[in-house]
């Protein structure tokens, strides 16, 4: 429902004020001088929530991402994967319907990345949030998605939209299944179609 008399900037500003979406960056972007619970609670402070409601939401989201008991730690006291989970908790804290994630696991080693992929799927099942996840990893895209939008580089355009019929319950070994590999090949073909090497 967009008011055509207003510019898109006004629409985006309204969405920001209404907290229509949460955003998770490539790097955790945690403030070093704030504890994890104060980092997670920052958007709630900005929104003007009461101390009681803020504490409840922070505790709930830290528990949701598996960081219960780490709220009083500082970012430097956590591993890279734990810092990224704190960043996800911060994005979830104000209860937006849409979570935008820009390569949040790109800098992590493969084992930690696999673990966070499993946790993100579980988080999605628990919350029902819409998650838009940007990645350059074909296996990660196929594992996490029920819809994959394949894009070309410069200029960015959609080369394919793939509806995944993988089951909602996805153990890591699903990546060895024929269905998974077929979807991954279709993603690869879409990427290849969008690239020019001339």
Across the structure, where does each feature detected by a protein language model lie?
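Conserved signature/switch motifs of ABC ATPase nucleotide-binding domains
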Residues: 73-76, 94
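Short coil-to-helix segment of the ABC ATPase nucleotide-binding domain corresponding to the Q-loop/switch region
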Residues: 34-41
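Single conserved hydrophobic/aromatic residue that forms the stacking wall/gate
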Residues: 1-12
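Hydrophobic anchor residue at the start of the ABC signature
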Residues: 88
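Catalytic Walker B motif of ABC-type/P-loop ATPase nucleotide-binding domains
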Residues: 99-102
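Conserved ABC ATPase "signature" region
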Residues: 41, 45, 52-70, 122
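Catalytic "switch" loops of ABC-type ATPases
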Residues: 26-31, 137
